[in-house]
Amino acid sequence: MTNKVRFVPGNTEVEVQTGENLLNIAASAGVYIHAFCGGDGVCGKCKVQIEQGAVVSDRTMKLSRADFEAGYRLACRSRVEADVVVRIPDQIRRDGKALKQKPKTTRAITARTLEALVGTWDVSPPVEKRYLELPPPTIDDNVADMRRLSRAISAGCHDCKEPTYDHPELLRDLPFLLRKADWKVTVILLRGKRVEEPDRIIGLEPGNTTSKFYGLAVDIGTTTVCGVLIDLNSGKIMAEASAYNAQIGYGEDVISRIVYAQRPGGLKALQEKVVYTLNNVIETICKKVGINAADITYIMSAGNTTMEHLLVGLDPKFLREAPYVPICSQFPLTRAAAIGIQAHPSVRLFLYPSPASYVGGDIVSGVHACQLHKSAALTLFIDIGTNGEIVIGNQEWLVCAACSAGPAFEGGGIKHGMRASTGAIEKFHIHPDTYEPMVVTVGLAKPRGICGSGLISIVAELLEAGAIDQRGKFNRQLDSPRIRDGADGYEYVIVWAKDSVLGEDIVLTEVDLDNLMRAKGAMYAGYVTLLESVGMTFADLDRVVLAGNFGAYIDLEQAISIGLLPDIDRGRFFYLGNASLLGCQISLTDHHRFRERVEVFKLMTHMELSENPHFMGHYMAALFLPHTDMSLFPSVRAKLAG
């Protein structure tokens, strides 16, 4: 159910889901409300007046009885339950004009948008469960047990090839299981990789277990491991869970982990940690649904090249040494139990292929999900992160590259940077006269630090307000106690110590700004260099797809303002969220789409940006906000001029 919210003065109107938080709504709509406790309810500054309609909100000590009866509420403590008109008390500037509202950026992935990108898929998984009642052997029919099983599987299918089998454990257990089950069994079949290949018997269970048929899609991230359980009979998502990758204790980025893997016992420790994390995700999911891990029939996974190597116990040593070569690009089918994963003993682990050392299976999975290999639309596919990955192309060709953006987007190298967890500042607006902030945190909790989306938001707002210049330097002439000379040079105080969890001021420093500009500069230089390598520019693009959880939370206008994304028609941008996980879900459910994985991989040509002589020039040009060439950012130039 949706409701309309109109903010006055300014008459900014948005449509929102019933129950959404009013402070979050205002921040997403570009409406400034004075608030600096992150939405924790302790500063009392986000006072608004409900002129029409109603919100659900309790009176707090920050509101007098008279104010409450007059319709005043704290935005951070109010949920929209009907159409409302909200008056913001401090919306008048010193010149008497109402504050100009920012363009609203819609980030939600609607079902229609998702279908336009990824299409539809069937519920016809690559693994099949089939219940069989076999005739017991007799003197007249005393064929081998495996022959009897294969014959029953092929019965009624004239064109089918007799299924194969691939592991001795199956033969060892087969005669005892068949007889104990009175010849009534459920066979688990893996469809042939190609239409002409026979199916493969990978498991056998006593009785009829076809109702318990589950698959697990997994994104093995450097920071987080995410899993989705799917009922393979219906295609329905049953549960989701995620956990921090326990490898973090050995290093926060892939380079640190590759280095650690070279220590005695390091590779084994890293593999055990990622398997431990995956097992925790499986355990959480199974508890939610009320099933056993043994009910999971197969696992489809993707991750960057380092994570995929470590998961199956392959040494990633040569990924970081020129000429940056992985051990393999297409990983062999692996029995999950053999590497310690808790699932059915017959479960196979499928991994998406990785084109290069720093362009992994997670990107192939994302490209596969949004069907670049089937679309005539020329697409720029971006996964923003420490190791920014880029793909350009369509159904005829695909080129891919990675650019080392550094950890700024994930909180690394930022004085008060952190991952996007509770208390992280994720949205920010600034008053153009007083330079006082509007701060919204993840979970509307007391501020703890700044996550990647918050960093982009803060820098974009400071730039537009004139608090920093295009070199990323603070305007030292401004009359504001929040801009000061700190221990690491000039800085802006986002949250005072008394309002933060840390008990110290949360600040953004000029060093932080430098690190952000290097990160966004590397990404932008990557787009331009890769486009140039195929003789194209941003004008040739039909669409830009932002993948990854981070991409789903950044504000489009603010990302363009700092030069992280190109200044092109906003209608060409699409948000896909965790595309890697989505690709795994599709392959898990539809065997036709499953078979396309390798086609996508083979279509992708990798380019090494570090070897391109033009990359460094584009990188240096992008070390400005938004860029040294403002003609590339006409909308930002107009905002900064006006």
Predicted features along the sequence, with ranges:
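Local cysteine-cluster metal-coordination motifs and their immediate loop/turn environment
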Residues: Y32-D58, R65-A82
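Nucleotide/phosphate-binding catalytic cleft detector across ATP-hydrolyzing
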Residues: S64-E69, L74-A217, T222, S234, ...
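Glycine-rich phosphate-binding loop of actin/hexokinase-like ATP-binding domains
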Residues: V218-T222, G227-D253, K317-L333, S365, ...
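N-terminal phosphate-binding loop and adjacent alpha-helix
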Residues: A246-K287, G413, A424-H429, N515-R518, ...
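Short glycine-rich phosphate-binding loop at a beta-alpha junction
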Residues: A293-N304, V459, F538-G548
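Short glycine/threonine-rich loop-to-helix capping motif typified by GTGT followed
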Residues: N304-F318, M536-A539, G548-D567, L609-H618, ...
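Catalytic phosphate/nucleotide-handling subdomain of diverse soluble enzymes
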Residues: N394-E396, M536-V600
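A contiguous, well-structured pocket-lining segment that forms one wall/lid of small-molecule binding clefts
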Residues: L463-S533
